Curated annotation (Swiss-Prot):
Pfam families registered for this protein in UniProt: DUF480
Gene3D superfamilies, per the entry: Winged helix-like DNA-binding domain superfamily/Winged helix DNA-binding domain
InterPro entries from the UniProt entry: DUF480, WH-like_DNA-bd_sf, WH_DNA-bd_sf
Name this polypeptide is given: UPF0502 protein swp_3027
Family: Belongs to the UPF0502 family.
Length: 217
């Protein structure tokens, strides 16, 4: 499944509002446009017109990722997603995974810590490890939905990005790490143990090279 930046924003807003304000869901074009252009909880901040949002909805409808719903006695058309967790969706996500994908669609690459802090209205993570577990599950799917970005210079933590929008990947200068890359939260003891094993292996290799050189002389 591939989305444009505008499609990702629309889907993200529909997911968010379904979870946080279910009484107002599905959304009208006006409400959806306001949600897309919010000044908070959105990165980047956009300024889409209703016409642009409507064009995006038309594109998503062709991909069968949204549907229209008209209320009884109302002429206002409202929109709901078919992105995941519906009878029409191939994609099924648990609550933790859904909250994670929603935030990545709305706010771009983020660290596990940022995702936990920003997810309180979508899903309650008890700690960062639960966020990392959700990210790991999403990254290890047959068709990965997220990937770990290389750590930025001067930053303590690496960020994760969603893989629905190729535009986002093209804009970043960070190489994408393999989905099976070791998480950056490995304990100090694990890292020290790994370094010790590597040092032993390097020492053995040096000894073998020295033996080979001695035989060649």
């Amino acid at each position: 499944m591939e989305l444009t930046q505008h499609e990702a924003r629309v889907i993200g807003v529909l997911l968010e509002k379904e979870l946080t304000t279910p009484e107002q869901y599905p959304l009208s074009l006006n409400s959806l446009t306001s949600g897309c252009n919010q000044k908070t909880s959105r990165e980047p901040v956009l300024n889409l017109s209703e016409s642009e949002v409507q064009n995006t909805l038309d594109s998503l409808a062709k991909k069968r990722l949204i549907s229209e719903q008209s209320g009884f006695g109302s002429r206002v058309v409202k929109y709901k997603h078919r992105f995941c967790n519906t009878e029409f969706s191939d994609l099924q996500l648990n609550p933790a995974q859904l909250a994670t994908i929603c935030l990545l669609l709305l706010r771009g690459p983020q660290t596990p810590g940022e995702l936990r802090t920003r997810s309180n209205r979508l899903h309650e993570f008890n700690d960062v490890r639960e966020v990392e577990h959700a990210l790991d599950e999403l990254a290890r799917r047959d068709s990965p939905l997220v990937a770990l970005l290389a750590k930025q210079p001067g930053k303590r933590e690496a960020r994760y990005c969603q893989l629905f929008t190729t535009e986002e990947l093209e804009l970043t200068t960070n190489p994408i790490l393999h989905k099976d890359a070791e998480p950056q939260t490995s304990s100090r003891a694990e890292l020290e143990d790994r370094v010790s094993k590597l040092e032993v292996e390097v020492g053995e290799l040096k000894a073998l090279i020295q033996q080979f050189q001695n035989k060649s002389q």
